Amino acid sequence: MRFERTNTVLCTCLLLSLVSVGWGQAGGPERLITGASEVSPLANPTRSRLEFDSSDARLVEGFNRAKRQAMAYVFDKDPVGPWYEAAEPGREAFCMRDVAHQAMGAHALGLARYNLNMLRRFAENVSDAKDWCSFWEIDRFNRPAPVDYANDSLFWYNLPANFDILDACYRMYLWSGDLSYVNDPVFLNFYNRTVTDYVERWGLSVDEIMTRPRLLNVRGIPGHKKFQSARGIPGYDEGNHEYAVGSDLLATEYAAFLAYARIQETRGNADAARTFRAKAEEIRTLVNTKWWNDEGHYFYLRVGKDHSLEGHDSGNLLYWNVVDDSPRLKSAVADAGSRRIEVLYRYGDPDAARERLLDIMTPGRSRMEYPEVPFSTVGAVVNGTMGINLVAPSALLSGVEGGWVETSVRTLPALGTHIDWAELRNLPIRANEVTLRHEGNRKTVFTNQSGPALVWYAEFPGSHQNLTVNGKPVPARVETLPLGRAVSSVRVTVGAGGTVTVSAPE
């Protein structure tokens, strides 16, 4: 999951509840707390079948609150087509960054066709006149949101957006199996323009990015107060107006190049896939060498206006998985991990992740009324707590590997020491709907409720010679995850309507 995904994902959004100041009739200040109301389950006719249960009552309560809030933001009868809110509350709109970071939670809630429509709206609106940008934010009337767009010369745009959306499109292809993502000419044009023309127009190639000016392609009225300095912000940080490149720009570009390569593999374009895997590796090498401060043992945060590297924060790089598994990774996790739920789950600290997750679920402690928070919370439970992720080997291997399947399910329980059991029901995965139950970190039960047979990799922490599958010992495969963590797994086929139980030795 991506917590949402910000360099921020669960980070930028997990803000404290907004407190605003109004004025009473007598002219004195009156404190108004926004987002304090409970959302009724009947607030929106769209229903989600996703259910979560656990020995951890606080986690269940928080999940259900997030689910209700997220589903209250779902709409189906506006000119833009099926959509959910993914912007500041009250905008009646969805922006590129937030959609990319909410998409996983939305898919889990059963909103695959909403994701497809919204992502396609962004894809269809890239244009030469906007220097291959799309509309940063689209409202329910299928217009560029007026608050962010005046015309093709004057508009708000954060440059990681194209990359973030491309990566989200590939992820949603994996989870939904919808071939529109890899065959629709509208999507293909967006992908192609993003990794070529967009990169060239905005000076984002590896050879240029470290020396690019902060602003390029300045158009419109000189000195325009709002849009002139915001048409091509080189990161998601909107508070600093001096930097030339944010680490999130490189991190999202890396993710986009990899996603593009995988899409080309799916389409059988081996040469293009190899080219963009190599481009992704060039970015990864740049980050792990030039952006690393060897003396201070940290990654830099940005390129400043004088083109020197400055600041430090590894969160962006860890979120998009750019950091090599080396001593740098341990330092990076220590530097930024405690602030990012997904990073805590990914690198093996489920107890800390749970505490952070419970904190943002607590009413009055987080901006639950901000759409990214509830959607990302749902995604965090799916990908983090339950450890459910999809694996997609290269499609180019399909002709040489006898056991190749396009997509398989991989689970690694992350209940930690405070959760005895947890169960997620009715999770959509491509043409299937599944239920997964973890009993501690040593036993998992997988039910293929509907759809064709699935390949499931059941993983458990530690090095084990055998795992038990439906009561019978089966040789396990032992792998080493980043930071030297051993996991043992077995590959199991779960037929339609079937249930398989896998357990590890105590």
What residues fall within each predicted segment?
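Low-complexity, Ser/Thr/Pro/Gly-enriched N-terminal "stalk/linker" regions
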Residues: 27-94, 117, 286-287, 291-294
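Bacterial N-terminal signal peptides
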Residues: 11-20
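Non-catalytic C-terminal accessory modules of carbohydrate-active enzymes
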Residues: 348-506
